[in-house]
């Protein structure tokens, strides 16, 4: 009887501690509510009435900066008028299952929808598979208030610059639609050496000729806003989360405004 009781107590203890055990750091194991988050949040966003001015927040490179990310969420939840938050890649540091889960546990506390694009660190280990399961397609888009928002994988180095990333034919197809203006989100900017140099000209040409309002990136870990190709297209790079900084982009029919905020 004592042996049976001890066995039951041990099973209860192990069940309560299941989150502490992993069979492998490279495992892929997500709960159903942790899957396909970008599409779920697109559906949430579409249910929110469009205001005269669309205001969205961009952050980058959350990686291992969990405390700073918690503070960011608390800061955003105190504000009004924000439509959504975009995490611009390097969600994780090592592409591990637990890292994806930890970041989502923090960001799901936001009172507005959030979206994430894939970064180069997210393609380490089984990270690419985990990203696909947790967030969905690496290239995705949605329309809100007549504006088009496009998420694009630009992590060319992770596939050996084999010509597959970024997928410019897909991007061209997305830019063929009818919209007021498009905003492109990706992790690696075209002026980084980790962007396929054979695709820089075609990428920048697509933006210049297809009513793109801004190309928005992370990866560099420092904030910048510039016109590097002197073609009228602005390039925004957001700082890494440890810099305790984010960008607020406000858009209406007359202008687009960008501000860096600190918390």
Residue ranges and their predicted role:
Residues 47-56, 141-151, 177-181, 227-234, ...:
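Beta-strand-turn-beta hairpins that frame and shape the catalytic cleft
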Residues 20-37, 59, 142, 224-263:
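Binuclear metal-dependent phosphoesterase catalytic core
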Residues 61, 89-90, 119-120, 187, ...:
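Active-site glycine-centered loops adjacent to acidic/histidine catalytic or metal-binding residues
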Residues 1-17:
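Sec-dependent bacterial lipoprotein signal peptides
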Residues 17-102:
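N-terminal active-site segment of His-dependent metallophosphoesterases
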Residues 62-67, 91-98, 123-128, 159-162, ...:
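Acidic-and-aromatic substrate-binding clefts and catalytic sites of carbohydrate-active enzymes
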Residues 69-139, 143-144:
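Core catalytic region of metal-dependent phosphoesterases/phosphodiesterases
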Residues 74-85, 148, 159-234:
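His/acidic metal-ligating clusters that form di-metal
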């Amino acid at each position: 009887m004592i042996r049976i009781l001890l066995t039951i107590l041990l099973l209860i203890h192990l069940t309560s501690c299941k989150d502490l055990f992993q069979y492998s750091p490279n495992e892929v194991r997500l709960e159903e509510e942790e899957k396909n988050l970008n599409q779920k949040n697109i559906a949430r966003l579409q249910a929110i009435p469009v205001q005269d001015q669309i205001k969205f927040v961009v952050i980058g490179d959350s990686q291992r900066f969990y405390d700073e990310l918690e503070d960011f969420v608390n800061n955003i939840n105190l504000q009004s008028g924000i439509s959504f938050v975009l995490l611009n890649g390097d969600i994780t540091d090592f592409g591990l299952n637990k890292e994806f889960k930890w970041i989502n546990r923090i960001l799901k506390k936001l009172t507005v929808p959030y979206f994430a694009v894939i970064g180069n660190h997210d393609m380490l280990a089984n990270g690419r598979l985990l990203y696909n399961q947790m967030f969905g397609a690496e290239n995705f888009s949605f329309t809100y208030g007549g504006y088009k928002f496009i998420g694009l994988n630009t992590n060319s180095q992770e596939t050996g610059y084999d010509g597959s990333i970024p997928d410019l034919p897909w991007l061209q197809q997305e830019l063929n639609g009818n919209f007021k203006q498009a905003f492109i989100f990706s992790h690696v900017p075209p002026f980084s050496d980790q962007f396929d140099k054979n695709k820089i000209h075609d990428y920048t040409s697509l933006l210049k000729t297809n009513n793109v309002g801004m190309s928005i990136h992370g990866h560099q870990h420092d904030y910048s806003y510039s016109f590097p190709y002197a073609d009228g297209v602005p390039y925004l790079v957001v700082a890494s989360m440890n810099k305790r900084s984010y960008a607020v982009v406000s858009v209406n029919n007359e202008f687009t405004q960008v501000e860096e905020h600190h918390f």
